[in-house]
Amino acid sequence: LTEKDSNVEVAVAVLQRPDGTFLMAQRPQGRAYEGYWEFPGGKVEAGESSYHALVRELHEELGIEVEKAYPWLTRVFTYPHATVRLNFFRVTSWEGEPHGREGQLLSWQRLPDLSVAPILPANIPIMRALQLPHLYAISNATELGTEVFLQRLQLALNNGLRLLQIREKDFPRPVLRELSLRAVELAHGSGARVLINADIELAQEVGADGVQLTGAQLAACDARPDFELCAASCHSAEELHRAAELSLDFALLSPVLPTKSHPGAVNLGWDRFATMAASCSIPVYALGGLQMQDMEMAWQKGAHGIALLRQAW
C-alpha cells in the first residue's frame, strides 16, 4: 500500500496446514507498518477477481500454486493512509513449499499462543475467527430424551466436537437448567464451548461460554452481551449486517435447504446463501437440512462451517 491509496481491494490468504498451523509473513522495510506480521496477500488489480489476485499474489510472494481456496470473510479496515477491503480466503491445499520470494520472513503459527509480534491491526479479529471449529452442534434432547442426548454428547465430544448450542424451546426452565448444567460440565471437560439459545440469564447461571441471540433479540440489542462467545441466528442480509455491527463472534444463516423442523419454509438455497455470506465480516455457519457431507459445499459457498441438529447425534 502506498500513501496515495484511498480505497483498496486486497486478497488475503490464511494458509492452513492439516495440523492446524497457519502462515504469517512480516511486512518488509519501507512499507506502511513495516515489521508487522500479517497474513500474506496483496492488491486486487483492475479487471481481476479477488480469487485470481490471491492465486497471483501467492505465486509472486511465496512461490506456491494454489490448489484449494475457500472464500471466508470480508472486512473493511481504515488505516491512516488508506481504507482497505480485505477479502480473506482459507487456503488448504497448494503445490510447493512457501518461501519469501520478496525477502520477507515467514513463520508458521498456532493459536492461541502466537510467537510473532506485533500483528497487523486488521488481522487481529481474524485470530478469534480461526479458533472457531467448523462444526456447530445444536442439542436435540427433546427428541432423544435427556439421558440419551447426554450420552450422545459425550460420544461426540470424544470424537472432537468443540462447539455446542443448547436449544430446547419446549423444556420447562428447571429441566432446561439441569440439562444445561450437565452439558456445560461435559463440554468443559473436553475443552469444548457451549452457547445457550436466547436465555442470557440462564447462560450466566450455568457457566456457559456464551449466548445465541434470536433474530428478535438481535434487533433489540444495543450492545454485545458480555460473554466470551456471542452469536446470532440470522435469516436475512440485514440481520447478518447487524450481527457484524455488534461485533458478534459468528452468525447462523438459515434455512439453506428444506428442513424437517420447518416444513414449507422458504429456503435460501446455496447460491443465495453464498451471496449473503460474501459480504459478511464475521464467520457464518450454514444451517438447515444439512449433513456432514455438505461441509465441502458450505466452504465453497463462503461458510465457516455448518450447524447440525438431528444429524449431529
Question: What are these model-derived regions, one by one?
Answer:
Residues 2-23, 74:
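Conserved N-terminal beta-strand and adjoining loop/helix that marks the start
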Residues 17, 75-98:
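Active-site-adjacent beta-strand/loop module that shapes the phosphate/pyrophosphate-binding cleft
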Residues 21-61, 72-73:
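Conserved Nudix-box catalytic region and its N-terminal flanking loop in Nudix hydrolases
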Residues 88-92, 98-131:
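NUDIX/MutT-family hydrolases
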Residues 133-148, 229-234:
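Active-site mouth loops of central-metabolism enzymes
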Residues 137, 164, 203, 243, ...:
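Conserved, mostly hydrophobic/aromatic
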Residues 176-198, 215-218, 222-236, 265-291:
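Alpha-helix-loop-beta-strand connector modules within alpha/beta enzyme cores
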Residues 214-223, 250-264, 289-313:
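Glycine-rich phosphate-binding active-site loops on the catalytic face of alpha/beta enzymes
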